């Protein structure tokens, strides 16, 4: 019984490592929504746009924030805390 438990525990650890490696450079839909809404608020409060807004069909702040996100020009870093206490930093700016 102790061996089965250790086997399950090692499988869980392996699953967590695989999960972290797969999702390390991807954002969840909740993170994307949070980033776009935060940037839209900044734009609404008067922050300058990081892209040329003349090339965008719609000039509302959410569309501008979405386009900035798609182009990868946002200087925002997301900090993820994993259950094991490890912290992963994800930069949204594309090199």
Swiss-Prot record:
GO terms for molecular function: DNA binding; DNA-directed RNA polymerase activity. It catalyses: RNA(n) + a ribonucleoside 5'-triphosphate = RNA(n+1) + diphosphate. SMART domains: RNA_pol_Rpb6. Coiled coil: none annotated. Its main location: cytoplasm. One of its GO terms (cellular component) is cytoplasm. It is found in: Cytoplasm. The keyword tRNA-binding does not apply. Its EC number is 2.7.7.6. The keyword Nucleotidyltransferase applies. Transmembrane segments: none annotated. Keywords: Cytoplasm, DNA-directed RNA polymerase, Nucleotidyltransferase, Transcription, Transferase. It holds the Pfam family RNA_pol_Rpb6. GO terms for biological process: transcription by RNA polymerase I; transcription by RNA polymerase II; tRNA transcription by RNA polymerase III. DNA-dependent RNA polymerase (RNAP) catalyzes the transcription of DNA into RNA using the four ribonucleoside triphosphates as substrates. Part of the 13-subunit RNA polymerase complex. NCBIfam families: PRK01099.1-2, PRK01099.1-3, PRK01099.1-4. This is DNA-directed RNA polymerase subunit Rpo6. It comes from Saccharolobus shibatae (strain ATCC 51178 / DSM 5389 / JCM 8931 / NBRC 15437 / B12) (Sulfolobus shibatae). The gene is rpo6.
């Amino acid at each position: 019984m102790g061996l089965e438990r250790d086997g399950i525990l090692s499988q869980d650890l392996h699953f967590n490592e695989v999960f972290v490696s797969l999702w390390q450079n991807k954002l969840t839909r909740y993170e994307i929504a949070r980033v776009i809404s935060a940037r839209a608020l900044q734009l609404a409060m008067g922050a300058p746009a990081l892209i040329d807004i003349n090339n965008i069909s719609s000039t509302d702040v959410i569309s501008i924030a979405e386009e900035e996100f798609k182009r990868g020009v946002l200087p925002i870093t997301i900090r993820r805390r994993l259950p094991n206490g490890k912290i992963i930093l994800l930069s949204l700016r594309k090199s």
